[in-house]
Amino acid sequence: MAVTDRFARRATLSRSLRLLSEFRYEQPDPARFYGALAADTATLVSDLWLAARGESVAGRTLLDVGGGPGYFASAFAAAGVGYIGVEPDPNEMHAAGPAHAGGPGSFVRASGMALPLADDSVDICLSSNVAEHVPRPWQLGAEMLRVTRPGGLAVLSYTVWLGPFGGHEMGLSHYLGGARAAARYARRHGHPAKNNYGSSLFAVSAAEGLRWAEGTGTLIAAFPRYHPRSAWWMTSVPMLREFLVSNLVLVLSPR
């Protein structure tokens, strides 16, 4: 069984539309948006693990690089996973307020580009929508592989710059260029975007990610995170994937 076979059956058009409908709540109601995304991500990782290892993910240890305030912790705890979140920004760690205070999992304040864990220390290492926010995304990827045990899974998912959501809250203006889009946003709103091009948002292509992953010798799957299975072929088409894949999932298994 290929590692994506189980999840591919869930990757339906109705799932894609359901997740798309939640995106409008990211700013006004983050608990709703991230709660839905966390539940979907826990299912994704559980399916990948079961297909790869032939056993339930329950009882395994997962490191979430860029875990934020804990929405993902609750979803993985419900699946029986031991959760460790790594987050460099204290504001992000407490963004959910009391709703997640004292919740499941443990949290460490640290950078994903220098993880404070020993080699081969977790079963699964996840990074969801973080790589486009750091200046050296493949250093982050290398750290994920370092801390993942042989035979485990490293799942790195990121927003592709030239896709429709690459500009984040700057909207489609990122097609005018990142610096121009950032300046335009600041003029219109009177302050820089939270995801500000050049400091907290960077242009990361699908080609870069695939090239890095293939170069590690550990890549076992790559597919668009939010697309129905019928559209996964886009990942294999240069240029087209930059505009239409939107969010790329790289699944790696260290040896």
UniProtKB/Swiss-Prot annotation:
UniProt keyword Transcription regulation present: no
Enzyme Commission identifier(s): 2.1.1.-
Enzyme class: transferase
Record bears the keyword Transferase: yes
Any one Gene Ontology molecular-function term assigned to this protein's record: S-adenosylmethionine-dependent methyltransferase activity
One protein family per Pfam: Methyltransf_11
Family, as annotated: Belongs to the methyltransferase superfamily.
Name of this protein: Uncharacterized methyltransferase MUL_1123
Organism for this UniProt entry: Mycobacterium ulcerans (strain Agy99)
Lineage per the UniProt record: Bacteria, Bacillati, Actinomycetota, Actinomycetes, Mycobacteriales
